[in-house]
From Swiss-Prot:
The complex is composed of two ATP-binding proteins (CysA), two transmembrane proteins (CysT and CysW) and a solute-binding protein (CysP). Residues 3-233 form the ABC transporter domain. Part of the ABC transporter complex CysAWTP involved in sulfate/thiosulfate import. Responsible for energy coupling to the transport system. InterPro entries: AAA+_ATPase, ABC_SmlMolc_Importer, ABC_transporter-like_ATP-bd, ABC_transporter-like_CS, Mo/tungstate-bd_C_term_dom, P-loop_NTPase, Sulph_transpt1, Transp-assoc_OB_typ2. Keywords: ATP-binding, Cell inner membrane, Cell membrane, Membrane, Nucleotide-binding, Sulfate transport, Translocase, Transport. PANTHER family: SPERMIDINE/PUTRESCINE IMPORT ATP-BINDING PROTEIN POTA, SPERMIDINE_PUTRESCINE IMPORT ATP-BINDING PROTEIN POTA. This is Sulfate/thiosulfate import ATP-binding protein CysA. It is an enzyme of class 7 (translocase). It comes from Synechocystis sp. (strain ATCC 27184 / PCC 6803 / Kazusa). ATP binds at G35, P36, S37, G38, S39, G40, K41, S42.
Length: 355
């Protein structure tokens, strides 16, 4: 069941939550709406569900105009961040709730509940109450309850946001495996870049009520459409074009109408650190080293006082043996310039000064 969004906009007073959104979610795909708070991702999900009505535009589900269709008639499964399970009902009763409301035959209901308990890997726990389950197990039950009525579309609003990091990671892998089994058209909201990249077939990056880019995790990471996307999907150094680091590199600087050169964007993984100089490297001093298991973060201050962050894998770290105060030589393997870009701050940007 595909979902098509045509020119959808939504205002809340003076605040524009969505502005001329156009999007197609292909049949059977798992799509992530990714963005910071206030980007419009949850409003778009709620509009698809029927919890918010657009001020303009059209929402088409399975070829039918659902823009003004009541939420109860859309046949959509919805999973919230905080489970919303009935505390006084057992797990079986929670899963069966939607089927019983729809007057489903008892024998069929029982069969469907057992099927879903197996699907969410909670066989044998059907007679327990929500309070007797872990957070991860409760979220699986919430998902099973949403799937019980065999919805056309599954919507998930930050489903793992209330769980700790280890459980979130386990459930991400489980959700991806589950989707590969049921092939239900699904849309989930998240502000977690890693979650979106690990789980989704396609990612919709949103900012300020607009779509910045749509693509696979690889497409968005390797070919970001804007400085916002590059900064939001992973960390990035934003450096002045006249930094000594780029004196040896031949790519042409872009200049804006006012004559200012756009900054250069380099991901921490795209720096190479050397113990000896070559023709394309510049000298710097290591200011700080942070060991993160399989990865090492190295902050380097260049001779012109430009500060950069580089990432090393374990093998590179063993070869370089980075320590604070050590002199190194650094060069970018890959650098990107966006026409019209400025050095406007963003949470995930690492600037070339003041680290």
């Amino acid at each position: 069941m595909s979902i098509i969004i045509n020119n959808v906009s939504k205002q809340f007073g003076d605040f524009t939550a969505l502005k001329d959104i156009n999007l197609e979610v292909p049949d059977g795909k798992l799509v992530a709406l990714l963005g910071p708070s206030g980007s419009g991702k949850s409003t778009l999900l709620r509009a698809i569900a029927g919890l918010e009505e657009p001020d303009q535009g059209q929402i088409i589900i399975n070829g039918q105009d659902a823009t003004h269709v009541d939420i109860r008639k859309r046949n959509i499964g919805f999973v919230f961040q905080h489970y919303a399970l009935f505390k006084h009902l057992t797990i079986r009763q929670n899963i069966a709730f939607g089927l019983e409301i729809r007057k489903h035959p008892p024998a069929k209901t029982k069969e469907r509940v057992e099927e879903l308990l197996s699907l969410i890997q909670l066989e044998g726990l059907g007679n327990r109450y929500p309070s007797q389950l872990s957070g991860g197990q409760r979220q699986r039950v919430a998902l099973a309850r949403a799937l019980a009525v065999q919805p056309q579309v599954l919507l998930l609003d930050e489903p793992f946001g209330a769980l700790d990091a280890k459980v979130r990671k386990e459930l991400r892998a489980w959700l991806r495996k589950l989707h590969d089994e049921v092939h239900l058209t699904s849309v989930f909201v998240t502000h977690d870049q890693e979650e979106a990249m690990e789980v989704a077939d396609e990612i919709v990056v949103m900012s300020n009520g607009k779509i910045e880019q749509v693509g696979t995790a690889e497409e968005i990471y390797e070919h970001p459409a804007s400085p916002f996307v590059m900064g939001f999907i992973g960390e990035v150094n934003v450096l002045p074009r006249n930094a000594s680091l780029f004196n040896y590199h031949a790519f042409e600087p872009h200049s804006s109408n006012n004559g200012h050169q756009e900054p250069v964007f380099v991901r921490p993984h795209d720096f190479e650190l050397l113990t000896e100089a070559d023709d394309a490297s510049v000298a710097g001093t290591i200011k700080r080293v942070i060991h993160l298991g399989s990865e090492i973060q190295v902050e380097v201050l260049l001779m012109d006082n430009t500060a950069v962050l580089a990432y090393l894998n374990r093998e590179q770290g063993q070869q370089l043996n980075p320590k604070a105060g050590k002199k190194v030589f650094i060069k970018p393997r890959v650098a990107k310039v966006f026409a019209g870009a400025s050095s406007a701050a963003s949470t995930h940007f690492i600037y070339g000064t003041g680290i």
